[in-house]
From Swiss-Prot:
Gene expressing this chain: ndhD
Disulfide bonding pattern of the chain: none
Regions that span the bilayer: 4-24, 31-51, 87-107, 113-130, 134-154, 167-187, 211-231, 242-262, 274-294, 305-325, 330-350, 386-406, 416-436, 462-482
Classification via Pfam families: Proton_antipo_M
UniProt-recorded name of the protein: NAD(P)H-quinone oxidoreductase chain 4, chloroplastic
UniProt catalytic activity: a plastoquinone + NADH + (n+1) H(+)(in) = a plastoquinol + NAD(+) + n H(+)(out); a plastoquinone + NADPH + (n+1) H(+)(in) = a plastoquinol + NADP(+) + n H(+)(out)
Cytoplasm is among the record's keywords: no
Keyword Ribonucleoprotein listed: no
Known EC number: 7.1.1.-
One cellular-component annotation, GO: chloroplast thylakoid membrane
Family: Belongs to the complex I subunit 4 family.
PANTHER family, per database record: NAD(P)H-QUINONE OXIDOREDUCTASE CHAIN 4, CHLOROPLASTIC, NADH-UBIQUINONE OXIDOREDUCTASE CHAIN 4
Membrane topology: Multi-pass membrane protein
Name of the top EC class for this enzyme: translocase
């Protein structure tokens, strides 16, 4: 059993199963939903089994490696492997995608294509987190682009084509930099082309080339993460997408940018990373404040949550730039934490819209009494988003603060200023979140909404929300539940020379 190509199986299974969907009878919409949900759940259980019985968590090396020669002419290999950093994001992908599939249950328009696209996106994201070849990394980066574009353009709001096109142009533009960087790294040197991560890490690049490569990759990841000022596609995309797609975007897609920033920029280009790290911290601090202030001015509920996501990603950037063991641990934990919280908030926004048929805060008010379950869950996840102690966001943000403060590479003045700016962002977060809750659920406007007659959450919706809430509480109370996955990997990253 240990010799099976486990990683190839979990990467290929979703998209292969999706190709069978056209064979289902035309009136088998319910069957397609159950089939897709079953495939997602099977893949999640399979990866849980693999990591439980075939992975050694105290080992920082790449494990479960698979290497198959794919295109010999250009030395392109199907090479997969995982370490502690990959595992957390792969499990997050499986968990959020399974719940997003369940969230898409009410969609009745063209369900065959919808569920195939979700499965194709699932494979692309798993493949990216498991890639050990930089060309394969690029291929998987591109694979999820088309499913997301179609999900946005076919199941969205009135401006869905505009937002989908904007997403496509931004992401495709960033992908060019990944391809150029991958080819430059692979072809550099006198030993022939190689795109293997391990071999690329051993190459010694001239500092000028390393800086140029770092900048190119940074632009691509800045679009996906996103990093200010390349973030403008995100509010438009979230504002128009169906909430099941929003769950995948907030829960998984944004984390691809953070993953690339650590996996390629930090691991393969360490000297350039040490030069850029102060600038990452400054940009992250500015982003926290900017996005929080912008969120406060949003009338549209989805756009307010979208800017909240941008603000929270600022902490990830600071943690990556902190150049400390604690800060990087906090950044990875923040990625996982936000994946759960962001997915839950967008699901709640979508279920609220299904009932009251409006996304504008000034048209809401007084809906806490008719839908107390949604009110309770919305309040709970908002508390998680503002990093209430006892929840996952608090631990992650505290570790990031600690990482910045304890890095003596930076002057004490710089550390104090950055900490103060980020702390202001933490003060602004409850302001825009609590204001959102007040305008939605309190007051006397309930009869003014387009649909004043609606029901509270059903069993399916409560199940999704509870599944997302339990790990948030679990990580908040016992962070080692997640930290043990990648502690050894983070130690290995800092064992290399950055200077």
């Amino acid at each position: 059993m240990s010799n099976l190509p486990w990683l190839t199986i979990i990467v290929i299974l979703p998209i292969s199963a999706g190709l069978l969907i056209p064979l289902f009878p035309h009136k088998g919409n319910k069957m397609i939903r159950w089939y897709t949900l079953g495939i997602c759940l099977l893949d999640l259980l399979l990866m849980t089994y693999i990591f439980r019985y075939h992975y050694h968590f105290d080992n920082s090396l790449i494990q479960l490696e698979e290497d198959y020669n794919w295109i010999n002419l250009i030395h392109f290999h199907w090479k997969l492997g995982i370490d502690g950093f990959s595992i957390g994001l792969i499990l997050l992908t499986g968990f959020v995608t399974t719940l997003a599939t369940l969230a898409a249950w009410p969609v009745t328009r063209n369900p065959r294509l919808l569920h195939f696209l979700m499965l194709a996106m699932y494979s692309g994201q798993l493949g990216l987190f498991a890639s050990r070849d930089i060309l394969l990394f690029f291929l998987m980066w591109e694979l999820e682009l088309i499913p997301v574009y179609l999900l946005l353009s076919m199941w969205g709001g009135k401006r869905r084509l505009y937002s989908a096109t904007k997403f496509l142009l931004y992401t495709a533009g960033g992908s060019i930099f990944i391809l150029m960087g991958a080819l430059s790294m692979g072809l550099y040197g006198s030993h022939g082309p190689t795109f293997d991560f391990e071999l690329l890490a051993k190459k010694d690049y001239p500092i000028t080339l390393e800086i140029l490569l770092y900048l190119g990759f940074l632009i691509a990841y800045a679009i996906k993460l996103p990093i200010f000022p390349l973030h403008t596609w995100l509010p438009d995309t979230h504002g128009e997408a169906h909430y099941s797609t929003c769950m995948l975007l907030a829960g998984v897609l944004l984390k691809m940018g953070g993953y690339g920033l650590i996996r390629i920029n930090m691991e393969l280009l360490p000297h350039a990373h040490s030069l850029f790290s102060p600038w990452l911290i400054i940009i992250g601090a500015v982003q926290i404040i900017y996005a929080a202030l912008t969120s406060m001015g949003q009338r549209n509920l989805k756009r307010r949550i979208a800017y909240s996501s941008i603000s929270h990603m600022g902490f990830v950037i600071i943690g990556i730039g902190s150049m400390t063991y604690t800060g990087l641990n906090g950044a990875i934990l923040q990625m996982i934490s936000h994946g759960l919280i962001g997915a839950a908030l967008f699901f709640l926004v979508g279920t609220s819209y299904d009932r009251i048929r409006t996304l504008f805060l000034d048209e809401m008010g007084g809906i806490a009494i008719p839908i107390p379950k949604i009110f309770t869950m919305f309040s709970s996840f908002s508390m998680a988003s503002l990093a209430l102690p006892g929840m996952s966001g608090f631990v992650a943000e505290f570790m990031i603060f600690l990482g910045v403060i304890t890095n003596h590479k930076y002057s004490s003045t710089f550390r104090i200023i950055i900490t103060a700016i980020a702390a202001i962002g933490m003060i602004l977060t409850p302001i825009y979140l609590l204001s959102m809750l007040r305008r939605m659920f309190y007051g006397y406007k309930v009869l003014n909404v387009p649909n004043p007659y609606f029901k509270d959450s059903g069993p399916r919706e409560l199940f999704i929300l509870i599944c997302l809430f339990l790990p948030i509480i679990g990580i908040g109370l016992y962070p080692d539940l997640v930290l043990f996955l990648y502690n050894a990997k983070v130690e290995a990253i800092f064992s290399q020379s950055f200077y």
